[in-house]
Amino acid sequence: FPDKDIIEFPFTEEKMNLSGALFDKDKLHNICKNELSKLSEEELYDFLYDWAKENEPEYVEKWFGDREKMLQILRLYMGVGAKRRRKDLMYAKQIFELISYFFDGESAEEMDEFKLDEDMVSKILKSYLAKYDHNDDNSVWFNKLKEIADEHGFASDMKAYKANPENFKGNVSDIAEAVRIAVTGRANTPDLWTIVHIMGEEQMTERIKKHIK
């Protein structure tokens, strides 16, 4: 056995086989995905906090200043506490990049483009804010998206849209996508109703107003 502490033996790749399993990123990432999915809510929170404190100390207060907000985000994105856990996230930096839009001053590196033209997006977002009530549950909230669809010539009924798509400008999913991109900068996210309730009405409204002409 060596008689010196391990820290006195600096790690070097020079005499190692770089094609071995230790340097196989795919295998390493696969292990990380599985291990992250096993962490409890508190363990995952602590893991991310420790990583941020060491690697991104300037963001610690922003990310972790509201403990309950971060826990809600992790429940949504990682499935913490749910029957099915998300198993495609591999490391802390990836997770923070994914959830960055929840925090003011941060956004996706490249905002996804709206499929609809600016005028239509503006009209949809105006209607959305006019009808929005933060106390609405998910069902009532989505029914209001359907109302907006009908008001602007989009199909609220997917069966009707599939039967005669030429009769409509689009469907209710296009309405939801316009709101989603305005709020998060991304066309694909987890449940939008949950996202806006984690963010809060004020933050959501400020972001939407930036896209209203």
Residue ranges and their predicted role:
Residues 27, 44, 91, 141, ...:
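Residue-level detector of well-ordered alpha-helical segments, enriched
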Residues 1-110, 114, 184-213:
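Catalytic adenosine-cofactor/nucleotide-binding cores of aminoacyl-tRNA synthetases and other
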Residues 4-11, 74, 100, 105-106, ...:
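Short amphipathic alpha-helical segments and their helix-coil junctions
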Residues 113-157:
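Long, amphipathic alpha-helical coiled-coil segments characteristic
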Residues 146-213:
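Charged substrate- and nucleic-acid-binding regions of tRNA-handling and nucleotidyl-transfer enzymes
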Residues 31-35, 131-132, 152, 182:
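Alpha-helix C-capping/helix-to-loop hinge sites
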